[in-house]
A protein has these predicted regions:
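Outer-membrane beta-barrel channels and translocator barrels
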Residues: 73-75, 142-144, 173-175, 245-247, ...
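Outer-membrane beta-barrel "beta-signal"
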Residues: 388, 396, 427-440
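Transmembrane beta-strands of outer-membrane beta-barrel pores
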Residues: 50-54, 84-88, 151-157, 170-172, ...
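Membrane-embedded beta-strand positions of outer-membrane beta-barrel proteins
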Residues: 46-48, 80-82, 149, 179-183, ...
Length: 440
């Protein structure tokens, strides 16, 4: 997952920014386009960042980003970005905590891991490296009309994503109003080590019942599908950006997304419990093979005498019955000596997918779809942080960001039989985010 957002494209050589310039830069940020340099002779603008993300006893991520933008004249702009990130640590398997020791087979089928009584089952060998490349070209097509097209490539150990995009932006009323439309197509393939699990197949665990290693491997691979699977995604975006006055800018977006293909997480399982809440088996999850989402987004930027206020709200709904609300706010205060501070607060809340179940009951019939992944369950989350940036004597910009993130899964209404009532089934996920960025 991308942990670093693209840096705002601003003219780093400016020692001060008046209100009109601030609104112009904000317009570019809202449209997702690079800001236009005052003079194409200034050459390339480079943004770099290094980010650390660390969860308590879970995932740790390091991410490096290099982004480059160049105006070749007459607003013919190229922008590119290279992202490399590495993730290690422990990832939740979806199984439920138990009052006794639990044994799990690793997703590859090679080896096992043990979970202590009362602990959330985590696979502590989670490790992955991702390389992502993006390129975008933007240019005027005629007066007040701009076109943009781009490509996206992301590669992990077992996952490949390719995407293309295109968009148009039309200005009206002396560029005070902009209408935009964008379309993208993505093709993803997944080929996990050990194969893709058969839906609701029971996890094969070697407890000494197999006479030979070959017998175990035969049982394991009987629950697997060999070869890769894929998913396609089409995204449509409609946008309206309006300059309200010399201080205020507002944007409205509507987005539609349709994905078809393999949506199941091959690394997630569900616990099957008896009436006492004790685990009887572990089954691999199964999700629907298509998903449609609608997104509604509003953002306002207000240029103050000594800074910029930024507030946004997003509502998302899909046919998995996941509804989410996101409020994001940033308040930048300009300080003496060409520096600034920017507090940040973000709140997120979502409902559970219709097929989300924290566990299955052995007395119930098997559902068509089910997942115990907390990421499709009911939850709330918040981020609280602070960024400090400064413009150096040579016009370059250096910034530091430190944030605290907490995610709180919730029980969406399932009864907890027997021993589960004495266990922590929905632990919070807490993380620290630290970033340093340098632009020149």
């Amino acid at each position: 997952m991308q942990l670093i957002k693209g840096q705002k494209k601003q003219n780093r050589r400016a020692k001060a920014m008046n209100i009109n310039t601030a609104l112009a830069a904000a317009t570019c940020a809202l449209l997702g386009a690079p800001a236009i340099a005052d003079n194409s002779d200034e050459g390339w603008q480079i943004d770099t960042a290094l980010l650390y993300y660390g969860e308590s006893d879970r995932v740790t991520a390091l991410e490096a980003v290099v982004a480059a933008t160049k105006d070749f004249g007459d607003e013919h702009i190229f922008s590119g970005k290279l992202i490399i990130d590495s993730l290690t640590g422990a990832s939740a398997s979806g199984a439920i905590a138990q009052p006794s020791v639990q044994t799990f087979t690793r997703p590859s089928g090679k080896g096992q891991y043990i979970i202590a009584p009362g602990d959330t089952p985590l696979d502590d060998t989670f490790k992955d490296t991702r390389i992502q490349f993006e390129a975008q070209w933007t240019q005027p097509l005629r007066e007040d009309l701009r076109g943009s097209t781009g490509i996206h490539l992301s590669n992990e150990y077992d996952y490949l994503s390719l995407a293309i995009n295109g968009s148009l932006a039309q200005d009206f009323k002396q560029k005070n109003t902009t209408l935009s439309v964008g379309l993208s197509y993505a093709y993803d393939t997944i080929d996990p080590e050990g194969g893709r699990p058969v839906s609701f197949a029971e996890m094969v665990i070697d407890r000494g019942q197999f006479a030979t290693e070959a017998a175990y491997e035969a049982a394991f691979y009987a629950t697997r599908q060999q070869g890769s699977d894929d998913k396609t995604t089409i995204d449509l975006l409609l946008g309206l950006t309006q300059i309200i006055n010399r201080r205020m800018l507002m944007q409205f977006n509507y987005g539609y997304s349709r994905s078809d293909g393999y949506h199941t997480d091959p690394f997630k399982v569900l616990s099957v419990l008896n009436n006492q809440g004790l685990s009887q088996a572990l089954l691999h999850e199964n999700r629907p093979d298509q998903r449609s989402k609608h997104n509604f987004y509003w953002q306002t930027k207000y240029a103050m005498d000594n800074g910029v206020a930024d507030l946004s709200y997003r509502f998302s709904t899909d046919d998995w019955e996941i509804d989410s609300h996101t409020i994001d706010s940033r308040l930048r205060f300009n300080l003496p000596n060409a520096s600034y501070i920017q507090p940040h607060f973000r709140y997120y809340q979502q409902s559970a997918a219709e097929f989300y179940q924290p566990f299955l009951r052995d007395s119930d019939s098997m559902p068509q779809y089910a997942s115990a992944d907390y990421r499709v369950g009911e939850m709330s989350a918040y981020t609280l942080g602070l960024k400090y940036g400064m413009t150096l004597d040579n016009g370059d910009e250096l910034a530091f960001r430190l944030e605290y993130y907490q995610q709180d899964p919730k029980n969406p209404g399932f009864s907890e039989p027997g021993v589960l009532q004495d266990l922590q089934l929905y632990p919070s996920v807490k993380a620290i985010i630290a970033q340093v960025s340098y632009s020149f």
